[in-house]
Amino acid sequence: MPRSVPSVASRERRKKILKLAKGYFGRRKNVWTVAKNAVERGKVFAYIGRKQKKRHFRGLWIQRINAGTRQHGLSYSQFIGALDKANIKLNRKVLADLAMNDPEAFKAVVEKVKK
C-alpha cells in the first residue's frame, strides 16, 4: 500500500516545475502550462550543453597547445605526432595547462619531443 501523505501529489508536481521556472520572464514563471514547456525546453538545452561543453573545452585546449608550440617553432599537428612517437602520455588538458601556467615545463616537453 502506498504511503499516505497529507498533500496532493499533483500540487507537488506543479510546485516543483514552477520552482524550476523561477527567474523566467513573463508568464513562463507563473503559468503552469507555459512554465512546464519552458522548463522542459530548458532541460533539453542543458543536456545538449553538457555534451557541447566537452567539445568546446577540447577545442580550447588545442588552441592553447598550438599557441604554445608555435612559440617554439612547431605546429600543433607536428607536436602531437612527435609526442606519440616519443611515447609521452600527456593528455591535451594537461598540455594546455602547462602551456598556460608553466611555460618552462612546457618548453622542456617541446625540447624533449624535438630530439
Swiss-Prot record:
What GO cellular-component annotations does this UniProt entry give? ribonucleoprotein complex; ribosome
Any GO BP annotation: ribosomal large subunit assembly
* Record-linked PROSITE patterns: RIBOSOMAL_L20
Q: Which CDD domains does the annotation name?
A: Ribosomal_L20 (cd07026)
Which controlled-vocabulary keywords does the entry list?
A: Ribonucleoprotein, Ribosomal protein, RNA-binding, rRNA-binding
Kindly list the GO molecular function terms attached to this UniProt entry: rRNA binding; structural constituent of ribosome
InterPro entries, per database record: Ribosomal_bL20, RIBOSOMAL_L20_CS, Ribosomal_protein_bL20_C
Could you confirm whether the keyword RNA-binding appears in this record? Answer: yes
Give the family, as the similarity comment puts it. Answer: Belongs to the bacterial ribosomal protein bL20 family.
* HAMAP family associated with the record: Ribosomal_bL20 (MF_00382)
Q: What does this protein do?
A: Binds directly to 23S ribosomal RNA and is necessary for the in vitro assembly process of the 50S ribosomal subunit. It is not involved in the protein synthesizing functions of that subunit.
Output this protein's name: Large ribosomal subunit protein bL20
Q: Which organism is it from?
A: Cytophaga hutchinsonii (strain ATCC 33406 / DSM 1761 / CIP 103989 / NBRC 15051 / NCIMB 9469 / D465)
Lineage here is: Bacteria, Pseudomonadati, Bacteroidota, Cytophagia, Cytophagales
